[in-house]
Curated annotation (Swiss-Prot):
UniProt keyword list: Activator, Mitochondrion, Protein biosynthesis, Repeat, Transit peptide, Translation regulation
Keyword Mitochondrion tagged: yes
Phenotype on disruption: Results in increased expression of iron uptake genes and caused ferroptosis-like cell death. Modestly affects gfrowth on the presence of antimycin A. Reduces viability on glycerol- and galactose-containing media. Causes mitochondrial dysfunction, which is likely to lead to iron-sensing defect and iron starvation response, resulting in perturbation of iron homeostasis and increased hydroxyl radical production.
Coiled-coil region: none
Organism, scientific name: Schizosaccharomyces pombe (strain 972 / ATCC 24843)
Stretch forming the transit peptide: 1-33
InterPro entries: Pentatricopeptide_rpt, TPR-like_helical_dom_sf
A Pfam family recorded for this sequence: PPR_2
Protein name (Swiss-Prot/TrEMBL): Pentatricopeptide repeat-containing protein 2, mitochondrial
Cellular component GO terms held in the UniProt record: mitochondrial matrix; mitochondrion
Amino acid sequence: MQFIKRTFPRRAFVDLLLNRFCLREFATTYSVSVSNARKLVRKRLLIADALKFKEQVNNLNEFRNKKTKSSLIRNDGFKLAKNVSSLLQKESLEKALHLLYERSNAKKTVAYNLVLQYHLAKGHYNAAWSLYNDMKKRQQKPSDHTYSILLKGFCDAIEKNKQGNFSKLREYSEKVTASALKESNNVTSNLHHIRIISKCSLKLKSMVLVSMIIPSIKQTLDFYSGSQILRLLNDFSMFNPEQREEVLKMGTNLWNYFVLECQKKGIAVDESLICSFVKLLATSNSPQVRNVGLNILTKVMGLEYQIFEDSNLRYPLPPYCDCTSRSLVTALQVIRQIQNGDLLARYWKYFEESHKFDLNLQVYHEKLRNLVQQGQAAECLNTIKRMSHNGPFPTQQTFLIVLSLCKRPKFYSYTKSFLDLAKKLNVPVEAT
């Protein structure tokens, strides 16, 4: 105390005690207020969490309700399709259509597809077309499978239609093609449609379908469809001389696009596309164009042989190709088409000396067809004898090819020689 008295005056000591008391009271008050604030914040957080959880529960319940409704609609659609299928199996078409036209929220696309298949299988393509239009009117969106069913059905109807009345089928196919390529964004399904359409256009001989499908073929870079279209253009060029230049231009444009894209991507061009294009060039009125086609084929096959001198015409060559005997058969078919006997002898001689490809039965048959066209009966006989010694062994088809030459009066005397050779080789052949 003495120290306090000496150091602090009485007044200062009292002030110090008062200040300490106030600070303690302030600290107590502050801690209480902070605690209350924390409780309030915690309470608000709990309320927010509860509201958020309630919202999540409501969303989950809403999602479950929607899922339940959609699953019910989907189940109703499957049940409807199952009932329609069983009725169609019992040939109860009217009852199946009655189920389709009943009011319900079920998706009926699958059921419609079943009835479409039924109509097309029966050959009722007019009824199928009417049902397809009715399907769209009733807000039942056609699926990719719907278009596939229609296109394949029309294609099969063309094969079965012996009268050749394709006007309606052509009209239906063109309209379905436009819808399929417009509404389907799936590359895989589009590719499937393109292949069906290319097959359909080949049978219908429809240039409208060709012009519609070529942009899609370029987009997918599908060799199969490209080959089909080039085959169709080949037929058009052969039987429609007045449109030959236009057709050749269209085919060349498609060929250039395919080859340039393959060069960019470093992929091989399919052999069927090359053979189809060479056959198309062989229909040209210009000898130079026909010669260029054969030069392309020999270069692609890797043969160091140039049949004709290079002309001013330039076509892009594919980077590489895995060639088979199909290319050889195509070359012989082109030679037969342009009717050049000297070319056949030169080509065959070089071909035998190259030893790069297998001379199978199909190749020999194509050579024999060339010889029959040129009327070389003695050479046909010698070729068959070489086949019997070196292979491939002659078949009944081999002798039928050469016996067609004997139907001409000039070569009737060779009939006995061919039949005797067939008998010697134990090949069953009857004189026709």
